[in-house]
Structures are given as C-alpha cells and as structure tokens.
Amino acid sequence: MQLYTYFFTFSLVLILALADQENKSLDFTQEGGIAKRGAFQFSYLIKKYTGRNPLDYWGYGCWCGLGGKGTPVDGVDWCCYHHDMCFNSITQGPRPTCSKNAPYHKNYYFSGLKCSTGWLTSKCGRAICACDIAAVKCFMRNHFNNKYQNYKKNIC
C-alpha cells in the first residue's frame, strides 16, 4: 500500500507540474462539482482560494508534502501539520471514518468553502472535505514565506 501511495503522489505532482508548465487551468472540477480524485479536489481548492500553485506547498517547511516531523516552522507549516493530524484522526483508531488511503482518492462535494452534506457525499467524503477546507482556510490566513519552500527536512 505504501508503494501505491508514493506512486499516486508522484503522479499527482507530475500532472500538476505539467499543467503549470503549459499554463493550463488546474480546475479539475467545477465549483459544486466532483473531481476524479480527492487529491485533485484539494489541489483545486488551494489554487482557487490561495492563488498559488499547489506544488508551492510541496516540501514547504517540516510538514507540507509527504510525511512530516519536528516543530512546524511557521503558520503555513502549522496548516500542513493540522491537515496531517486531521487525516490521522479520520483514518486511525478503533473505528476510523475512512480507510488509510481514502484521503488520496475519495471524492467529495463542495460549494465554495463549504462541504456538502447531501446524500451523495459519504461520511468519509465529508470528513476528508472538512480536513481539506480547514487547511485551505488556514493557508489563506497565513503568509507564505518562500524561504521555507523546499525546506531541508533533516533539520526539522
């Protein structure tokens, strides 16, 4: 399963990089619509509401991107920390809301910065959506500091 997660993450990064390189839109979904994969929805929300390329957050500080350790370096990094902890809370424990890999492929509905509570959205989808929306709102409140991009994780 870990290999699947790395492969999917690499594929997502490659797709986003190619879309940015060719100045194509990252709008994988329409507002209020549904994307092919949950990770695309998170990327869409980041782009739409922060104006930044989602890849800007990849490797930012100690917690953004794959894995995470140490103390977050600033507000944006704290957003990533809380996003990771949010996913942990819905995928771990005696009765998890979602399977371990669901946050990377489970679809959800949203409108603006609100998750849909309609019958088409599962309990897991709503939980993932809530984690993603909270992270995007956090990104919007915090200053993105370029010096923490591609941060050396070994000093975390």
UniProtKB/Swiss-Prot annotation:
Cofactor(s) recorded in Swiss-Prot or TrEMBL: Ca(2+)
UniProt GO cellular component terms: extracellular region; nematocyst
Cofactor: how bound: Binds 1 Ca(2+) ion per subunit.
Paired cysteines (S-S): 62-156, 64-80, 79-138, 86-131, 115-129
Propeptide: 20-35
N-terminal signal peptide: 1-19
Active site: 83, 132
SUPFAM superfamilies recorded: Phospholipase A2, PLA2
Official protein name in the record: Phospholipase A2 A2-hormotoxin-Apt1a
Species, as recorded: Adamsia palliata
